[in-house]
């Protein structure tokens, strides 16, 4: 899980979602997991 000020899709399988008011990226590739904060 990377915590970044701005999250972006890295590949085609990345999805940008909102959980509990936080913007997150989830992906099949676990290296692409990101959270804004």
From Swiss-Prot:
Keyword field contains Membrane: no
Record keywords: Ribonucleoprotein, Ribosomal protein
Entries under InterPro entries matching the protein: Ribosomal_bL36, Ribosomal_bL36_sp
One cellular-component annotation, GO: ribosome
One Pfam match: Ribosomal_L36
Highest rank taxon of the organism: Bacteria
Any Gene Ontology biological process: translation
GO molecular function terms noted in the UniProt entry: structural constituent of ribosome
Record NCBIfam families: rpmJ_bact
PANTHER family from the UniProt entry: 50S RIBOSOMAL PROTEIN L36, CHLOROPLASTIC, LARGE RIBOSOMAL SUBUNIT PROTEIN BL36C
Listed HAMAP family: Ribosomal_bL36
Family stated for the protein in its record: Belongs to the bacterial ribosomal protein bL36 family.
Name of the protein: Large ribosomal subunit protein bL36
Natural source organism: Acidothermus cellulolyticus (strain ATCC 43068 / DSM 8971 / 11B)
């Amino acid at each position: 899980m990377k915590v970044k000020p701005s999250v972006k899709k890295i590949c085609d399988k990345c999805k940008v979602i909102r959980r509990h008011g936080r913007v997150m990226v989830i992906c099949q590739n676990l290296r692409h997991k990101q959270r804004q904060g």
